From Swiss-Prot:
Location relative to the cell: Plastid, Chloroplast thylakoid membrane
Membrane topology, Stromal segments: 55-142, 220-225, 298-308, 355-359
Coarse class of the protein's main subcellular location: plastid
InterPro entries for the chain: Sec-indep_translocase_CS (IPR019820), TatC (IPR002033)
Job of this protein: Part of the twin-arginine translocation (Tat) system that transports large folded proteins containing a characteristic twin-arginine motif in their signal peptide across the thylakoid membrane. Involved in delta pH-dependent protein transport required for chloroplast development, especially thylakoid membrane formation. TATC and TATB mediate precursor recognition, whereas TATA facilitates translocation.
Gene giving rise to this polypeptide: TATC
Stretch list, region Disordered: 1-23, 59-104
Protein's organism: Oryza sativa subsp. japonica
Transit sequence range: 1-54
UniProt entry tagged with the keyword Cell membrane: no
Membrane topology qualifier: Multi-pass membrane protein
Family the UniProt entry places it in: Belongs to the TatC family.
Protein name: Sec-independent protein translocase protein TATC, chloroplastic
One record GO biological process: protein transport by the Tat complex
Tissue specificity note: Expressed in leaves and shoots.
Length: 359
């Protein structure tokens, strides 16, 4: 019927039994169907969704509506373009349980700590994968190299142990302090102790290099870029702490003890206890100077922000005094204050550096 109507509406005047009329405009319009579905062949139109098919024919401006039940929906056939079938089909979404995909919640995906512990594959460098046995073998080799380097440094320091002892005695030697050997072999074991500390200090760069070389393949590209400043800053701060302890902290503490005993007793110190005091003070000060490095690591992971670090400055003051009392082997308040001051300054400097990084 649709084809016949179309032929009648487009036929020339005088054909099909309809004489030409110039004053009355009566024509049979094209059959309109709602909804209109394209069909490659003149087949009966049908709607897939809905119960009825409503058609309307207009003749001379007067509309007649016919209603007939729609036949059962046929199976969908692919049209030449394939767009109609794809538009009618609604893809079924994948079920989401508790707002998570694969057991990972959105909060975990947005957490900087989670991203630090479990980086995505795109951030990982293209390194060679190794089995657990290969890792253990590599760890064994690097430990062997570190022990060999420290052992060689200890032997070298032992060869010049007397010169090292004279250098460490310099802070109090000008004040007339005399060192005694109170037991047989005390000086020998003291030289071994001094050589061990100095050898560990000289071999620490090799140990640090081996640690970095072992953990570097497991780091992402961004973490590798961040590793260089951290290692360099940690090394500089460690040696700066040792230098500060040798030039400022140790002389101040030793002079306090000498002046306090002046006029009452003669200063005759055990060489073993003296070097125990000095070496522990040097290394504890170097370790305490690592506070800014720890702050940068915590800031990069996202655990603590710079504003949070600055908001607890009152507790930091108390903590610096307590840490100075624990780290210094002496019990005098002067040494504790001399160490607590730099610790507080390092903490504030570390918070400022974290703020510069945008954390």
């Amino acid at each position: 019927m649709g084809s016949a109507g179309a032929l009648l509406s487009h036929s020339p005047p005088g054909l099909g039994g309809f004489p030409p009329r110039h004053h009355h405009h009566h024509r049979l319009s094209v059959l309109r169907c709602v909804p209109l579905l394209p069909s490659p062949a003149p087949e009966p139109l049908s709607c897939r969704h809905g119960r009825h098919l409503r058609c309307a024919a207009v003749d001379g401006g007067a509309g007649r509506e016919t209603e007939r039940p729609s036949p059962p929906a046929p199976q969908r056939e692919e049209s030449p373009s394939g767009s109609l079938g794809a538009a009618l089909e609604d893809p079924s979404p994948q079920p989401v349980q508790n707002g998570s995909f694969g057991g990972i919640t959105e909060d975990e995906e947005q957490s900087s700590l989670y991203n630090f512990l479990y980086p995505s594959k795109e951030l990982l460098p293209d390194d060679k994968e190794m089995s657990i046995f290969d890792h253990l073998e590599e760890l064994r080799d690097r430990i062997f190299v570190s022990v060999l380097a420290v052992g060689a440094a200890i032997l070298g320091c032992f060869a010049y142990s007397k010169d090292l002892i004279r250098i460490l005695e310099a802070p109090v030697s000008v004040q007339g302090v005399r060192f005694l050997q109170l037991s047989p072999g005390e000086f020998f074991f003291t030289t071994l102790k001094v050589s061990g500390y100095c050898g560990l200090l000289l071999g620490s760069p090799v140990i640090l290099y081996e640690i970095i070389a072992f953990v570097l393949p497991g780091l992402t590209r961004d973490e590798r870029k961040f590793l260089g400043p951290i290692v360099l800053g940690s090394s500089v701060l460690f040696y700066l702490g040792i230098f500060f302890s040798y030039t400022v902290l140790a002389p101040a503490a030793l002079n306090f003890f000498v002046n306090y005993a002046d006029g009452a007793v003669e200063s005759l110190w055990s060489i073993d206890q003296y070097f125990e005091f000095v070496l522990v003070l040097l290394f504890s000060t170097g370790l305490s100077f690592q506070v800014p490095v720890i702050q940068l690591l915590l800031g990069q992971v996202g655990l603590v922000s710079s504003d949070q670090m600055l908001s607890i400055w009152r507790y930091v003051v108390v903590g610096a005094v307590v840490a100075a009392a624990v780290l210094t082997p002496s019990t005098d308040p002067l040494t504790q204050m001399l160490l607590a001051g730099p610790l507080l300054g390092l903490y504030l400097g570390g918070a400022w550096m974290v703020k510069l990084t945008g954390r």
